Design a protein with these regions (language model features):
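Short amphipathic alpha-helix with an adjacent loop that forms part of the alpha/beta core around
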Residues: 36-47, 66
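A short beta-strand-loop structural module common to alpha/beta enzyme folds
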Residues: 26-36
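Structural motif
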Residues: 7-11, 31-33, 54-55, 173
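Conserved acidic residues
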Residues: 27, 49-50, 71
């Protein structure tokens, strides 16, 4: 059984780690920058341990990267690199209107998401659900890694001319703006901003987090909807008024409609 030192936190890391733990011996899980000194100690004690990373959130120092040469630390990045380098590739793909979602396994280098690529896959027919997309991409990348540890192919360099970048999500992004956005854009923001920064809209003077929604079909009578700039409607299925518990649209109307 191959030994692994795993770097990561958040949903992408959780889904990837679940796959890796079934097939490998995880000798240490680094979750924060403060764990990097312990990584150096564990790696010296386990020189044959592979490094795998998924959504660690901080740059790995050169003194840590060097310990894993020549194989390097394998980074599961949820995009078709060099597209969507950076902190929010899945959310950026959702917001851009992409219908397919990709994952790359690359060798970690000092430059952000710029290392040579071992493997890429593109998944279609995924539900427009952020959790499902995270899970599918993390598992696809992790499964390839556990099946190829010890016999990795030669990685291929990225084409720097095709690189695009995405930044961190900010709390202010959660405020929906359907007065200027189409129903499609509003819906994609609701999907992309689940978890953080949380999509918000005000009904009857009550600010709410929108948890589940869909684009209303022609002729559909929605219980609760958000009117958008193109004349379309986003039907809200589940929501959470600030400071209150989650409820469906009908329950919200019964309690808050004036």
């Amino acid at each position: 059984m191959e030994k692994v030192i795993f770097f990561g936190n958040g949903p992408l890391a959780d889904y990837a780690l679940a796959v890796i733990e079934r097939e490998c011996q995880v000798v240490f899980h680094a979750r924060t920058r403060e764990d990097l000194e312990e990584v150096k100690k564990i790696k010296r004690e386990n020189p044959d341990a592979h490094g795998i990373l998924a959504s660690f959130g901080v740059m790995i120092r050169s003194d840590v990267l060097d310990l894993f040469e020549p194989e390097g630390i394998l980074n599961i990045h949820p995009s078709l690199l060099p597209i969507y380098r950076g902190a929010s590739p899945i959310e950026s793909a959702i917001l851009a209107g992409d219908s397919e979602f990709s994952v790359s396994v690359m060798k970690l280098v000092k430059a952000m998401d710029a290392g040579p690529v071992y493997y890429q896959a593109t998944l279609s027919d995924l539900l427009m659900d952020k959790t499902a997309i995270y899970k599918a991409l993390a598992e696809t990348g992790a499964e390839w890694i556990v099946n190829n540890l010890g016999s990795l192919p030669e990685p291929k360099p990225q084409d720097e001319k095709k690189a695009t970048f995405c930044g961190k999500l900010e709390k202010s992004m959660g405020e929906l703006s359907p007065e200027t956005d189409s129903a499609e854009v509003t819906f994609r923001k609701i999907v992309a901003y689940q978890g953080f920064p949380k999509p918000k809209y005000t009904f009857f003077g009550v600010k709410c987090i929108i948890l589940e929604a869909h684009i209303a079909r022609s002729g559909e009578t929605a219980v609760l909807s958000i009117p958008c700039a193109d004349g379309g409607l986003v039907a809200v299925d589940r929501l959470q008024p600030e400071g209150r518990k989650t409820m469906d649209a009908k329950s919200f109307l019964n309690g808050y409609a004036k």
